[in-house]
From Swiss-Prot:
Ligand binding (a ubiquinone): H202
Further details from the record: Heme 1 (or BL or b562) is low-potential and absorbs at about 562 nm, and heme 2 (or BH or b566) is high-potential and absorbs at about 566 nm.
Keyword line: Electron transport, Heme, Iron, Membrane, Metal-binding, Mitochondrion, Mitochondrion inner membrane, Respiratory chain, Transmembrane, Transmembrane helix, Transport, Ubiquinone
Positions with a binding annotation for heme b b566: H98, H197
Self-association and partners: The cytochrome bc1 complex contains 11 subunits: 3 respiratory subunits (MT-CYB, CYC1 and UQCRFS1), 2 core proteins (UQCRC1 and UQCRC2) and 6 low-molecular weight proteins (UQCRH/QCR6, UQCRB/QCR7, UQCRQ/QCR8, UQCR10/QCR9, UQCR11/QCR10 and a cleavage product of UQCRFS1). This cytochrome bc1 complex then forms a dimer.
The protein's role, per its UniProt record: Component of the ubiquinol-cytochrome c reductase complex (complex III or cytochrome b-c1 complex) that is part of the mitochondrial respiratory chain. The b-c1 complex mediates electron transfer from ubiquinol to cytochrome c. Contributes to the generation of a proton gradient across the mitochondrial membrane that is then used for ATP synthesis.
Gene assigned in the entry: MT-CYB
Protein name, entry field: Cytochrome b
Membrane topology: Multi-pass membrane protein
Length: 380
């Protein structure tokens, strides 16, 4: 009998074990689609980014013009740019939903997978930040100035560190060139980390909505979840293309249509929408170092979630108190996102401070307490 090439070929069997014959729980819902959607986002961003890089010039005198040239003179350049810019938004929508799914269903108890995932989030944020600087518009320049300047809050080495990162005494040509180099490099780091993420995931297998072991009831990934994933791809890509064609600048900042000018500060410096929740936390603390620490903590707190899990049940499916807290946290993050987009004045300052406080309180204090209380109520 001839050997089955798919199962015996050194390379094909790796693909087979990851995408075809992978045993998957029979009851995973649409919330488990976001991993593969993130994969599609990554591929889309790398392809469109490569095409953009072919026409882009990383020089302060030419960057803005090269982007304008792309949109005017390159065949479908406007489409490639709009897909790349809005693809970043979809990437973050998917990753936030993916993390939310992980928090709700207790997926963070696969500790290695979760920790690599948090590192992936940090790398994605770094990539998006350096990428936003490249068009060299007003918000690109001032965003880069404000955010890199935060490193100067680090005691003793801060100022030296910032000047080393800038390659001078302000954001200028060396900064732009190195940011372009980093923006080109980091997506490939993300690809590598994604493979590590999947390797750890396939050691334990997927979690499921009930949060119970599903070894007794597995189905092959292909055809069941390949078809399900393709439906997700079609929905997401149709939304992305619709946004890129009908409202390409909806999520952008109008300031970025003005070339960077170090002598004119925009009235409201703010990052892209997907960083606003963290930006609101940063602004809520009236001290530079404190703000930077809170900003870092807002993401790094995810590393602590596996350690803070006190419930005897893995998932929140049967834990109503934790569910209430979870959806309160979601609302809280949305409030932070909104506050981050508002100017720093009376009602927004206090709202931001309260939302920042409740963000950390829910994750660090209320989640473990509610879980312990539920154990008691359920006599577990």
């Amino acid at each position: 009998m001839a050997l089955n090439l798919r199962k015996n070929h050194q390379i094909l069997k790796v693909i087979n074990n990851a995408l075809i014959d992978l045993p998957a729980p029979s009851n995973i819902s649409t919330w488990w689609n976001f991993g593969s959607l993130l994969g599609i986002c990554l591929i889309t961003q790398i392809v469109t980014g490569l095409l953009l890089a072919m026409h882009y010039t990383a020089d302060t005198n030419l960057a803005f013009s090269s982007v304008a040239h792309m949109c005017r003179d390159v065949q479908f350049g406007w489409l490639i740019r709009n897909l790349h810019a809005n693809g970043a938004s979809f990437f973050f929508i998917c990753i936030y939903l993916h993390i939310g799914r992980g928090l709700y269903y207790g997926s963070y108890l696969n500790k290695e997978t979760w920790n690599v995932g948090v590192i992936l989030l940090l790398t994605l944020m770094a990539t998006a930040f350096v990428g936003y600087v490249l068009p060299w518009g007003q918000m690109s320049f001032w965003g880069a100035t404000v955010i890199t300047n935060l490193f100067s809050a680090i005691p003793y080495i801060g100022q030296t560190l910032v000047e080393w990162a800038w390659g001078g005494f302000s954001v200028d040509n060396p900064t732009l060139t190195r940011f372009f180099a980093l923006h080109f490099l980091l997506p490939f780091v993300i690809v590598g980390l994604t493979l590590v993420h999947l390797t750890f995931l396939h050691e334990t297998g997927s979690n499921n909505p009930l949060g119970i072991p599903s070894d007794c009831d597995k189905i092959p990934f292909h055809p069941y979840y390949t078809i399900k994933d393709i439906l997700g791809f079609a929905l997401m890509l149709s939304l992305l293309v619709s946004l890129a064609l009908f409202a390409p600048n909806l999520l952008g900042d109008p300031e970025n249509f003005t070339p960077a000018n170090p002598l004119v500060t925009p009235p409201h410096i703010k990052p892209e929408w997907y960083f606003l929740f963290a930006y609101a936390i940063l602004r809520s603390i009236p001290n530079k170092l404190g703000g930077v620490l809170a900003l870092a903590a807002s993401i790094l707190v995810l590393f602590l979630t596996p350690l803070l899990h006190t419930s005897k049940l893995r998932s929140m499916t049967f834990r109503p108190l934790s569910q209430i807290l979870f959806w309160t946290l979601v609302a809280n993050v949305l409030i932070l996102t909104w506050v981050g987009s508002q100017p720093v004045e009376h009602p927004f300052i206090i709202i931001g401070q309260l939302a920042s406080l409740s963000y950390f309180t829910i994750i660090l204090i209320l989640f473990p307490l509610a879980a312990a209380l539920e154990n008691k109520l359920l006599k577990l």
